[in-house]
Regions:
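Non-heme di-metal
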Residues: 1-323
Length: 323
């Protein structure tokens, strides 16, 4: 690969001297979007949770456990692995923000579990995540690139995880939300999706910047690698989806959602879509549930979700409004 000038010593970061304005733009977006799971009233979903069948509850817990694994990988390995490849100190700072928020996402699922589920059911779900071959396989695939020595391939794997691999799981809370179930949980997932949209966009952008520094042969090799990796991940994801959703008859809908987001991941990397439009016609109710207050899904420019609350509710007094 061509020579890329990496940071070779530590200097005090100066946000008044930004080499790439995208770093400052994304930093501001991520910090402006900051949220914590404790501020989302998931307990309001307890009555709704009680209307689900035993299998639906098990499926939902398994979906969230799978998402927890991906967030754990991205927070402790994936985003961190990108830091040594950063071209600017501000890029390093954005990756540390991404890593932290991935850990917040992983924590969020535990908040959902502790609110809605018994300890025994939680333990069963995590045991399932350790034993499910397709879930473990996708973890192994991305981890081998995170631990490799090719920076641009790391960014491809990271973008595919952020913009594609999460979505077999994100489908289910949007499905429940479209049926007026687990709506507060869905609000939390929308906050996660909003973050992941920025993460995938930014890492894909940095990939494109790095790709432009390579010669034509290397660029073609990386493009071929990207599509090969996507095919490998997609085939595994289809099996994972079948395992989760076959019994409730949602598999084909979820696969359309997967293909739709696979195309988005490729776009983040600067490549053309792989799947034709008739294979990505996602259920409109799901797209609407993704962003109920906007015409565009993945609207990460909006504020916190509609259920997001700050602090506990208290009675106000006249002097509270004297600013």
């Amino acid at each position: 690969m061509g020579d890329i000038k990496l940071i070779d010593r530590v200097s005090a970061i100066n946000w008044n001297r930004v080499q790439d304005e995208k770093d400052a733009e994304v930093w501001d977006r991520l910090t402006g979007n900051f949220w914590l799971p404790e501020k989302v009233p998931v307990s309001n979903d307890i009555p709704s949770w009680g209307t689900l069948t035993a299998h639906e509850k098990e499926m939902t817990m398994r979906v969230f456990t799978g998402l927890t694994l991906l967030d754990t990988i991205q927070g402790t390995v994936g985003a961190v692995s990108l830091i040594p490849d950063a071209l600017t100190p501000h890029e390093e700072a954005v990756y540390t923000n991404i890593a932290f928020m991935e850990s917040v996402h992983a924590r969020s699922y535990s908040n959902i579990f502790s609110t809605l589920c018994s300890t025994a059911d939680i333990d069963d779900a995590f045991r399932w995540s350790e034993e499910n071959p397709n879930l473990q396989r996708k973890a192994e695939i991305v981890m081998q690139y995170y631990k490799g020595d090719e920076p641009l391939k790391r960014k491809v794997a990271s973008t595919l995880l952020e913009s594609f691999l999460f979505y077999s799981g994100f489908y289910l809370p949007m499905y429940w939300s479209s049926r007026a179930k687990l709506t507060n949980t869905a609000d939390m997932i929308r906050l996660i999706i909003r973050d992941e949209a920025v993460h995938g966009y930014y890492i894909g952008y940095k990939y494109q910047r790095g790709l432009a520094m390579q010669d034509a042969a290397t660029q073609q090799e990386l493009k071929d690698y990207t599509y090969e990796l996507l095919f490998e991940l997609y085939d595994n994801e289809v099996e994972y989806t079948q395992d989760l959703y076959d019994e409730v008859g949602l598999t084909e809908d979820v696969k359309k959602f997967l293909r739709y987001n696979a195309n988005k991941a490729l776009m983040n990397l600067g490549y053309e879509a792989l799947f034709p439009k008739d294979e990505t016609d996602v259920n409109p109710a799901i797209l609407s549930a993704l962003s109920p207050n906007a015409d565009e899904n993945h609207d990460f420019f909006s504020g916190s979700g509609s259920s997001y609350v700050i602090g506990k509710a208290v009675n106000t007094e006249d002097e509270d409004w004297d600013f």
